Amino acid sequence: MADARKAALDTALKKIEKNFGKGAIMRMGDAAQTTISTISSGSLALDDALGVGGYPRGRIVEIYGPESSGKTTVALHAVAEVQKQGGTAAYIDAENALDPVYAEHLGVNIDDLLLSQPDTGEQGLEIADALVSSGAVDILVVDSVAALVPRAEIEGEMGDAHVGLQARLMSQALRKLSGTLNKTKTIALFINQIREKVGVMFGNPETTPGGRALKFYATIRLEVRRAEQIKEGTNIIGNRVRIKVVKNKVAPPFKRAEVDIMYGQGISQTGEIVDMAAEKDIVKKSGSWYSYGDDRIGQGRENAKKYLDEHPDVMTEIRQKVRDAYGMDATGEETSETDDQAKEAKDKGTAKNGSKGQSKSTKATPAETALDLGDQPTEK
């Protein structure tokens, strides 16, 4: 009886592979991927809070919070990290608010950044789908979900009711995107705003626009909020920002990270290194003084940060000790089979797009409307 069941199962598996291709179904133990492949967020503290050393490839991440809390800054740091590793990044700027000068200060190579400023929500999501399907994009940022306005709303009159239109649009788009993202190992970062529910007496009245689909499809959801201002004398030079991992499917959720976002500079690497090194006693804190080895590096946190900024060799040494202490060098490694699968998906996407380009007319595709930021004149 057991042999008959096994034979029937083997027949079914062969039939599935014949109809849908090799790899359509397999036993989990046969998969060679044992670790989650990640891209660093650009912040050591956030990488630690995420639990796997960064954003997982092939997944959807939502970053939401109040206005001017640092959501775009967090996303741009991820873009910079992808580009440092030789990857390709795309940015769907639905808010038409991306500052290329600020992005460049954060380490983004604006000449290679693919930028699209769509007219409607449908156009923006079609462009996103075309870019992800190509298999040649490593990270895609959509800024923001709230600004993806449906075509019917744009073409309609002010005051017209369009109940649930954006939610249906997002639900349909995410159904298509989620599978493609997993195959091409592309990270999709969706930036979102917050709204308040009317008439809520108990519980949190805050919610995010775009319906519930993004909440379900997102592997990671990050809540970004300003905690306090950073001052130098009477001048405000930045904000202390708290990032809470509200949802995490690849590691324990509800961890928090605190980072300094300095105006014009982005996330302060030295600030988080001081905090994390002090937590692991790599840098000793006695009263208000910070010391490393036999040397005092500053009285107060800001002076310790200045010392590390002025001594990059010391900062590099401490950073490596912090990474070792938090076990970050051991996470996010890819197996060779995973590399091959991602490469195969990219090659298939490129070949598919190439053949389409030869057979079709010169009509522009949605992906062709996404331009290199370097192709546009930038005022500095």
UniProtKB/Swiss-Prot annotation:
GO molecular function, one term: ATP binding
CDD domains (UniProt xref): RecA (cd00983)
GO biological process: DNA recombination; DNA repair; SOS response
InterPro entries hit by this protein: AAA+_ATPase, DNA_recomb/repair_RecA, DNA_recomb/repair_RecA_CS, P-loop_NTPase, RecA-like_C, RecA-like_N, RecA_ATP-bd, RecA_C_sf
Region described as Disordered: 329-380
Positions with a binding annotation for ATP: 65-72
Signal peptide: none
Basic and acidic residues biased stretches: 340-350
Chain intervals with Polar residues compositional bias: 352-364
Primary site of residence: cytoplasm
Classification via PROSITE patterns: RECA_1, RECA_2, RECA_3
A GO term from the CC aspect: cytosol
Localization per record: Cytoplasm
This protein's UniProt keywords: ATP-binding, Cytoplasm, DNA damage, DNA recombination, DNA repair, DNA-binding, Nucleotide-binding, SOS response
Transmembrane regions listed in the UniProt entry: none
Family: Belongs to the RecA family.
Role: Can catalyze the hydrolysis of ATP in the presence of single-stranded DNA, the ATP-dependent uptake of single-stranded DNA by duplex DNA, and the ATP-dependent hybridization of homologous single-stranded DNAs. It interacts with LexA causing its activation and leading to its autocatalytic cleavage.
Family annotation (PANTHER family): MITOCHONDRIAL DNA REPAIR PROTEIN RECA HOMOLOG-RELATED, RECA
Name of the protein described by the UniProt record: Protein RecA
Organism the protein comes from: Lactiplantibacillus plantarum (strain ATCC BAA-793 / NCIMB 8826 / WCFS1)
